[in-house]
């Protein structure tokens, strides 16, 4: 894990990066990627995958490993750096790479420049350089995976840091401006300052101390705790202002150990100022001083904020007083209307039984009295009475529907079919059954009334609607099928030729790919040759001793 040597980057071809990317893709589910898989993923046009692999091994971009069961290649940190730099250069973010500025336990910092000559900072994450025995317990990069690669963890760390940096920069926190990221590389603004650990004299230690403590509290108010807030992750410019760096290990204030992390950050700053600048203050923040203003931990998914906590937060939001009033009003209106409907239906049914004529009862139809109809026609009925009458008619129809639901389940299918046939016979003129017939006595009067009403509302269709053609049928009619009787095919012959040619080309490419994969997978041939050589040498030794 030395310095990045980008001198060979300009001489690498497209096929070299294709094979390097194939090794990276194979490492998603392989610790050691076999040669056959690399050849099939790369799918080089002219072959030669083994030759490129040997060149990449020579330049230490990949490494050859062989165990008792498998043998193949794995990606190194240098190869991962080349892939990230190639992508950033294609995006026109990085044009040149300069000197190394700093080395940390988890990252390397380099000076880079874009096409305009503006200097930026390149941070390459190097998780796994030092021993992290409890990494799975301290960081949540791996989620629920048991076996993870250090390259993959470095990529997750860079992605998380870029997300934090972007969110904090948009909220006016003193952090570098994020530019771009790819894989384990993060491009950010180059800060003109020095780390706080390298500074031995400050004009006003109290102001710097207050600014650091205010920054800790401000992070807590936004739902975040730095987790590693010390002199190594703070930079001081010429005006003695603090800039915060290196925060992929941030945790949420909802974390079970949030108070411990908060107190540790405060303790680190207090001890540093007391040792370096001989400054000690009795004023320092505590975890209870946090007043949450924003949920930045939810936005960037900080450690400790789970989906269960998010669901609990949604349940904890109380319903406003307006919502409660609306719900109670809706429930009360619905209950009152239902009771009133039933009462009105009972009253109206009793009145109909008293005032209805025998002929109307036998015929199964009901109507209003002559005086009421006359008043309605003349318009002499007041508005309130008209409204009440319309409401009562609606209530009666609803009551009739309720009675239908009670009667129909107890009737058999044959009875229902016989009733439908009798209803059809009743609908024909001159064939109406007498009032005292058995059919009418067996059937409830309201069912006969509904059947007569339904016959009055049958759909009406004129001649134009009967002769119209469905629209989607007209769209499928082609000119050749409608106007030509000589040809039965509706597909142009040119299109048929193109499809056949495309299919043949696809088959040829598939066959070439299979031959390429078979030719590249020469590891087994090498093993057979070694075994034959061992057998031959053992036989020669046996014949030499005369056995």
UniProtKB/Swiss-Prot annotation:
What PROSITE patterns does the record point to?
Answer: RIO1 (PS01245)
Matching InterPro entries, A to Z?
Answer: Kinase-like_dom_sf, Rio2, RIO2_wHTH_N, RIO_dom, RIO_kinase, RIO_kinase_CS, WH-like_DNA-bd_sf, WH_DNA-bd_sf
Write the protein's name.
Answer: Serine/threonine-protein kinase RIO2
Q: Protein kinase domain: from which residue to which, for each copy?
A: 97-273
Query: What's the Enzyme Commission number for this chain?
Result: 2.7.11.1
Q: Does Transferase count among this protein's keywords?
A: yes
Disulphide-bonded residues: none
Could you say which enzyme class this protein belongs to? Answer: transferase
Quaternary arrangement and interactors, per the entry?
Answer: Associated with late 40S pre-ribosomal particles. Interacts with PLK1 (via its N-terminus).
Q: Where are the transmembrane segments?
A: none
Primary location group: cytoplasm
Swiss-Prot/TrEMBL catalytic activity: L-seryl-[protein] + ATP = O-phospho-L-seryl-[protein] + ADP + H(+); L-threonyl-[protein] + ATP = O-phospho-L-threonyl-[protein] + ADP + H(+)
Function, please?
A: Serine/threonine-protein kinase involved in the final steps of cytoplasmic maturation of the 40S ribosomal subunit. Involved in export of the 40S pre-ribosome particles (pre-40S) from the nucleus to the cytoplasm. Its kinase activity is required for the release of NOB1, PNO1 and LTV1 from the late pre-40S and the processing of 18S-E pre-rRNA to the mature 18S rRNA. May regulate the timing of the metaphase-anaphase transition during mitotic progression, and its phosphorylation, may regulate this function.
Q: Which residues carry this modification: Phosphoserine?
A: 332, 337, 350, 362, 385, 390, 412, 417, 433, 437, 543
This protein's encoding gene? Riok2
Q: Which organism is it from?
A: Mus musculus (Mouse)
Q: How is it modified after translation?
A: Autophosphorylated (in vitro). Phosphorylation affects the timing of the metaphase-anaphase transition.
